[in-house]
Amino acid sequence: RQRQMCIRDSLKTDEYALSKARQEDILHRSGKNNWTVIRPYITYSEIRLQLGVLEKELWLYRALNGRTIVFSKDIAEKSTTLTYGYDVALGIASIIGKETAFGEAFHITSDESYTWKEILEIYLDTIEKKTGMRPKVLLLDKSPHLEWIGAKWQVILDRYYNRRFDNSKIQQYIDTSQFVRTESGLISCLESFLCHPQFKKMGWGIQGTYDRITGEWAPFSEISIIKDCISYLLHRTVVPPKSKLSI
């Protein structure tokens, strides 16, 4: 019953996955077939490396700056499928202009699946090999994102499921066995990133919440914008965990 209530509540939102599903429904009901749906799931590259629901700015930045990665057992034990972005691009290119692909949906994914715990170990081993430092990890029982309005649906309705995909349909157009192997691809991309690390928006509100959990502090010399300093300080010391999280 609780799961049904969660699904009902999530349907009131415009989360990316729900929005895409609604758009697919529109296409299927259109009575036309001049479309093709691509479902790539999670992709990675030299500039994007995810851990559960965390972008690299929320885990890798912490690791490289000596603070603890905050992850959770409930997600770590689930299986996922990560595909190198270039391979997805090759898959898309393989069906462009093919009439047999009209009116069809394709999962363009790797043949492999790993648990998030295994993905984390790949990251940790690579960072240790490259920097000589093994990052600290705090494994909570439950993801803290469950407590944050707007952030929980990706956990409950995606990362809480084992994600393995049937990619046999796209194999009619491209040999997915030639896709980059997940482990070697992640290692290569992370090593490349570590040579020239560049981070996007850091999400200092979330960083403050993580530091509240771990008992750590980010030096304010890392935070260049006053607004971000205030957000970090509020979430580190004042804002209750169940509030709407500001990044």
Identify the function of each model-found stretch.
Residues 88, 92, 108, 119, ...:
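Non-catalytic, hydrophobic alpha-helical segments
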Residues 19:
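Active-site helix of classical SDR
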Residues 37, 79-89, 105, 116, ...:
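Conserved loop-to-helix N-cap of the C-terminal "lid" that shapes the substrate pocket in Rossmann-like
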Residues 94-155, 199-205, 211-247:
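Mid/C-terminal beta-alpha module of Rossmann-like enzyme folds, strongest
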